[in-house]
């Protein structure tokens, strides 16, 4: 009996350890996350701080056409989730530049004032340094807000604006209760791999698949780092940026060819947890927001995907990549 109880105790401990190790501890600059292509760093000095922006610069693999595309990631992501898009674009002759924005991915987690204007400026400087005169700009989620700001500020630099399920199609501050950055920081500190998975399942995807776990492993892995409070503070600062700096009132000012790619089942709302279920049902309805946004942008085209959520390039990669390359 004693041996049996010891065996049970050992089994519980063993499986508990397996569960605890399921999400590895990651550094907040993702030093132990392998990116699909070599990572370089662009030095920046701002607010008296020397910081660095990580980026991948991937050459075309065949039939170089002399054109460039820059990819802007979403708030909960980094350059690591663009692999299939990079391959598709380099295969048709594009040079592809993939930055991790300051505060995200492998870039510095700086305590600064975050703004889409400043981010756009840094990306323009990066492109200038790399000798890029004009580029296709593809932005996903938060990257869609940044891509919009970039196109508004630098239309001469923007060959085409491509928006994949961008956030900011609603003015969140008109219906999401205001909370301070300090309050959002406390919320971010409570993040776990399980809470990340639950949010992704409920907002981002129509049906959860094991291959999506890599997104949770990264977003959840950093929560185990001793430096996670710094990550959480930056996440709170960029939440405030999104909340306070809408771009939707300027869609009509865009002067570049624009295409929206919309997964119609997306229900993303920034600050969703601050709403009741009834309130949530009134917002984040991309099957409506996509068309409404396209109507605001002169000459915009919209490509919608049924049975697809927030990240078409991951959820329906073949269909998305065909639509993407066909829009260039």
Locations of regions flagged by a protein language model:
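N-terminal cap/lid segment of alpha/beta-hydrolase-fold proteins
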Residues: 28-60
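Conserved serine/cysteine hydrolase catalytic core
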Residues: 42, 224-290, 295
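Active-site loop/oxyanion-hole signature of alpha/beta-hydrolase fold enzymes
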Residues: 45-49, 56-59, 91, 101-138, ...
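Conserved HGGG/HGGXW glycine-rich cap/lid loop of the alpha/beta-hydrolase fold
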Residues: 47, 51-106
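Gly/Ala-rich beta-loop-alpha elbow adjacent to hydrolase catalytic centers
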Residues: 139, 143, 147
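Flexible "cap/lid" loop of the alpha/beta hydrolase fold
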Residues: 148-152, 161-191
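Conserved alpha/beta-hydrolase catalytic His-Asp/Glu region
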Residues: 191-250
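Catalytic active-site module of serine/aspartate enzymes centered on a nucleophile-bearing elbow/loop
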Residues: 287-328
